[in-house]
Regions:
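Acidic low-complexity segments
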Residues: 154-160, 165-264
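Short, well-ordered strand-loop elements centered on a beta-strand within folded domains, enriched
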Residues: 141-144, 265, 316-320
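Hydrophobic/aromatic-rich core segments of domains that either
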Residues: 272-361
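Low-complexity, Gly/Ser/Thr/Pro-rich intrinsically disordered linker/tail segments
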Residues: 341-411
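Intrinsically disordered, low-complexity N-terminal segments that are enriched in acidic
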Residues: 2-185
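Active-site nucleophilic cysteine motif
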Residues: 229-236, 265-281
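Alpha-helix N-cap/loop-to-helix boundary motif
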Residues: 228, 262, 266-269, 295, ...
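A broad, low-specificity signal marking well-ordered, structured residues that form hydrophobic/aromatic
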Residues: 112, 129, 173, 261, ...
Length: 411
């Protein structure tokens, strides 16, 4: 876990909230021309339009306008009617894919390249830049086939590099690897209780997995007097899927308690709703642990977070609460595939939150919870996200293809 100064947190918030009211209203009217200022105030009140007050002025999240048209039901309907549903293609793909993999294991082999570029002159010429990039974790549904650099195994799976900064030039770090990913779906009618073998995954893990009063109240509402662990976990999964729409997230490092933030704002990205799910599960005595990395579905490749829960007679099973209920299907196994199931379009990098990198960073991290975008620093301090760019490419390859030759790719 990284401890940031108040000044650093405020600096990061200013980066995330750059737009004033006039700019935000203009951006909303680009999509919905006739919207009134009264309606904007109602969206602010409902938390659909996210802002903070900085130096006495309302400043809006850099992705607040797009999030508005995701989280407010009427605004979302308007957006879909005008532009179409940007998630329809993924739903169509899953509607065909998921029935094909239930009852068997699907395997995919991917070639993955990740590049991080520190902007020119962020670091003085001649200084050493230290860099950590993501790599495949040891995970039972994932096998590393080839990598051109040794992988450091910890909570966060990394490869480490150093380079010397040059004046006027970006400092570029790259890694490449090939891995196999497998799908999993556990279908069971067993409702027996688990044994309490994994107690470290039931306890609080501050600052985000904490059994606060809002968590206790919500648990009462969702769980009631239910004692069966499988049923409790499924009820939590269903409640989040029904009540918390996906929205792009502000930086986790600027949020005191992520599950409470989700409940207050009534939206969250994949990691935020996963932390809420994990906290509610742990509060109810269900072991839960973090898993994250990337989702690799064609045209939807992105960073992604999910988790695992432990139930007796099943052991650890994956849960992707962000993918949630598949509402296009009437088949219960399809609808709840991502409760105790995962597809093969995944890259796992992290097996927990807020771990230490290998070798350890000297300064605070840019991302204090997760690790996907890479981390960089020099002897003068951390290099934050606004000072570097990253990108990745992924290619599905034939299982029979030979591993790539690391000598032809280089470090």
């Amino acid at each position: 876990m990284c401890k940031l100064t108040k000044t650093e947190i405020e600096r990061r918030i200013k980066i995330d909230f750059p737009n004033d009211y006039d700019c935000t209203l203009l951006n909303i009217r680009d999509i919905m021309p006739d919207v009134s200022e009264k309606q904007v105030k109602l969206w602010e009140k409902s938390k659909a339009l996210e802002y903070v007050v900085i130096d006495g002025r309302k400043m809006y999240f850099r992705r607040a306008v797009r999030n508005l048209f995701r989280t407010d039901s009427r605004a979302r309907s308007y957006y879909i009617g005008k532009y179409g549903d940007d998630r329809a293609a993924r739903a169509e793909f899953l509607a065909k894919y998921l029935p094909e993999i239930i009852g068997k294991t699907d395997q995919k082999v991917f070639d993955f390249r990740f590049t991080l570029s520190v902007k020119p002159d962020v670091v003085p010429e001649g200084e050493t830049i230290r860099c950590w990039l993501p790599s495949p974790a040891e995970y039972r549904y994932q096998t590393l086939i080839s990598s051109h650099k040794n992988v450091k195994k910890s909570v966060h799976s990394t490869v480490y590099y150093e380079q010397t900064a040059q004046r006027g030039k970006p400092t570029v770090f790259s890694t490449r690897f090939r891995f196999r990913s497998r799908s999993f779906f556990y279908k069971t009618d067993d409702r027996s209780q688990y044994d309490n073998a994994d107690s470290k995954y039931i306890i609080e893990q501050p600052p985000h997995i904490v059994f606060t009063e809002p968590i206790r109240r919500l648990s009462e509402e969702i769980v009631g007097n239910e004692k069966d662990k499988h049923t409790i976990a499924k009820r939590i999964f269903t409640w989040i899927s029904d009540n918390i729409p996906w929205a792009a997230a502000r930086e986790y490092s600027t949020i005191d308690n992520i599950p409470e933030y989700v409940l207050h704002n009534r939206h969250g990205d994949c990691g935020q709703v996963t932390l809420l799910f994990m906290t509610l599960c742990r509060y109810n005595g269900i072991p839960a642990r973090w898993v994250s990395g990337f989702m690799l579905h064609t045209a939807y490749e992105n960073l992604h977070d999910w988790c695992e829960i432990y139930l007796d007679s099943t052991g650890w099973v994956p849960v992707d609460v962000s993918f949630g209920i598949q509402r296009y299907s009437e088949d219960e196994d399809i609808r709840y595939f991502y409760f105790m199931g995962i597809d093969a379009y995944r890259l796992v990098v992290n097996r927990g939150i807020s771990g230490e990198l290998s070798p350890p960073k000297t300064f605070e991290r840019s991302e204090c919870v997760d690790f996907q975008r890479g981390e960089v620093e020099w002897r003068g301090g951390n290099i934050y996200f606004d000072s570097f760019d990253y990108n990745f490419t992924v290619t599905e390859v034939s299982d029979c293809m030979q591993p790539f030759d690391s000598a032809t790719y280089g470090e």
